[in-house]
Amino acid sequence: MERPELPIGLPEDIEEKKAAARSWFEGLRDTICASFEALEDELEGPLSDQEPGRFVAKDWSRENGAGGGGRMSMMEGRVFEKVGVHTSTVHGEFSPDFRAQIPGAKDDPRFWASGISLIAHPVNPNVPAVHMNTRMVVTSSRWFGGGADLTPVLSRRRTQEDEDSQLFHKAMEIACRNHAVADYDAYKAWCDDYFFLKHRNEARGIGGIFYDWLHSNEDAGGWDADFAFTRDVGRAFSMVYPKIVRSNFNKLWTEADRDEQLIRRGRYVEFNLLYDRGTIFGLKTGGNVESILSSLPPVVRWP
């Protein structure tokens, strides 16, 4: 989708709005981490004789005098081979070559951004990988963006008719349909277009939703309406993905399933390093490299 021209100007209470968004993202992080640790405790199938995983949190600050930082929460366990749930709140100035790409930054390079980002790579190939992020960005304008998408790693499960796909899509649809500022059909199509490996002519997963530059006018509810929708995206994800994990994590798998999982993870690596907007944004704004690249799976294979 082509980037729109957003209105210039910020509300008088923008600092309060920044604080509210940051608080939400950090609270959602804690909720999701607790939920994922509970899944580690509940496992009864393969690998249940191993110790359940626990998140290890590491705070970081931007270097070279740039402002802000974040918390990187990583876990390696018996359900999740690798999962990262990260929050960050950063501010500073965009580099000259990056300003033209960002709404409201052409004439004033200052920015502030806060958000949550999550990628989970489960052990069991029957459990799909998942990605979710939501964020608020402020320049001389302001907007929300984010989304969530599901990546089954087994070809027999990587269909729109699969029960996991149906459950995930329904959760995202409800999150959108409850808000007039959201356009589910457009966000679903945007996700399909965004998470596509052009060099392979194939989708990364089964989709979900993706949105950016959400800046509603006051007649439509303004910032409050955009923030309410963004919160519901996080809530929907935090409820639906654990359901999907529970329905699959006790199933048996074969070596062939594991091989297929590792090959599919290779596609994840290719997308994140070649196309992912969040990865590029983080690296160009002095983000934490370890946190940014933690989205990459722990073990990968290319045929």
Curated annotation (Swiss-Prot):
The gene is hemF. The keyword Oxidoreductase applies. It comes from the Bacteria. Residues 268-303 are annotated as: Important for dimerization. The active site is at H131 (proton donor). Pathway: Porphyrin-containing compound metabolism; protoporphyrin-IX biosynthesis; protoporphyrinogen-IX from coproporphyrinogen-III (O2 route): step 1/1. It holds the Pfam family Coprogen_oxidas. InterPro entries: Coprogen_oxidase_aer (IPR001260), Coprogen_oxidase_aer_sf (IPR036406), Coprogen_oxidase_CS (IPR018375). GO terms for biological process: protoporphyrinogen IX biosynthetic process. It comes from Rhizobium leguminosarum bv. trifolii (strain WSM2304). This is Oxygen-dependent coproporphyrinogen-III oxidase.
